[in-house]
Amino acid sequence: MDITNAIINYRRFLKRKNCSKHTLRNYMSTLKQFVLCVDVPIEQVTHKMVLSFMDHLLDKRLKPKTINCYLNSIRGFYEYLIEEEQFPTSHPVKRGYSLRFSRPLPRYLRDEDVPRLFNVISSKRDRAMFMLMLRCGLRVEEVSKLTMAALDLPRSQLFVYEGKGVKDRVVYLSNDAYKILVQYLKARPSSRAKRVFLIEKGRFKGKPIQVRGIQHRMQHYAQIAGLKVSCHQLRHTMATQLLNADADLVTIQDLLGHTRIKTTQRYCQVSNLKVQRDYHKAIERVMHRHGL
């Protein structure tokens, strides 16, 4: 089979599975690099060639997590060839090839740091963007793509369409998030743009603000506040605060849009306040039972 046609067919297959544009772009980029590196017909690719490609990526000092993403792309391509195309070839990617790597625990803002950050944010737009991350758990990409049609203010909720993993969900606006969002919408310039958050200055004024622009704003405010904080940490903060307030783990999973509960469970490891509270409740019952 011609490699170009094989990759084109695979791309169509992924599109039929409703993979996001981001996923398609990453998969195609990986396969292009892999094909150029091995430089043999796809049916002649061996286990050793895959290992050699991994060595090439390690030499480029890519992180183990990134290399594993490359392997998953190649593995998926060959699974497609074998299962869907009935292509007579052996699978060159063994399961044991994935690299081990440490997963840092989610970082979150302490309670006293939240007002410290928001007190330096004067822009109504920026306060609204970051409040949606903190109170609704939106990812920075989801804030950037949020449309006016996704807002349901009468019900104090908004719809997140095609979040990570092409997963739709509903999130709810807290009182402060609702108030700050409405303040921005009243000040938002009249525009035909579908996106909620727009660039306010410069040659691109009135155009939708992009992910990098939002991240730059966060870096700006973090520096003023003297904090080390990223957009994603606001999302982590929301999850940790809900867990400390005894919210159900499945509820938090739904609000964050996690596909697997294991992803959400990682927040249990950083929720020290809840651990302390549960411990003292339990130990008091033990002491009472023993008459101490």
Locate predicted features:
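Conserved catalytic core of the tyrosine transesterase superfamily
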Residues: 1-292
